[in-house]
Amino acid sequence: AKQWFPGANMLVETRSGSSRKDDRQRLLAQAAANDWELVIVSMSSFGEMSMSADYLRDYRDSVLDEFERDLQEIEDNEVDEQTRRDNTRRIEQKRDKFEQSMNQKIDKISRGDTIPWDQTRGDYIIVDEAHNYKNLRRVSKLADLAEEGSDRATDLDVKLRYLRGEKGNDH
């Protein structure tokens, strides 16, 4: 990247020989402390950079509201009683699993002493190998269209929603 943007103020992840967690903390501290034009990190490090517990709570609540809207839509529009029960049960199970997973992440982050990704002042994300972030959770009345979702896709969704909401960007 330096050959393409020689005058750019950029931070590139490097390994110092200390633990990966220490390297990641150092990188997050540098990213938060300076006004970088470009920060380059590996996919694994990006995934380990968590959002703040407060933002994750907001995200969790927003997604749970989406689940509730889907459940209400089924209740209001599904004519067949058996189909209504089956779809409601399936969505409630997905909702409960999502909520449990998010609560575990929030608890883990709350106990940690890490700098959250949302304090790094980043305002744009470019993802190489985007196919690694596929399979975001999807709720549907049709079981074949419903998707459980991957943690990696959810992590990227959290960060992109943050940028869209906080920064007003449409990334």
Feature names for model-found ranges:
Residues 163-165:
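Glycine-rich helix-loop-beta junction characteristic of Rossmann-like nucleotide cofactor-binding loops
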Residues 1-160:
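SF2 helicase/translocase NTPase motor core
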Residues 122, 167-171:
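A short helix->loop->beta-strand "cap" motif at the edges of active sites that frequently abuts
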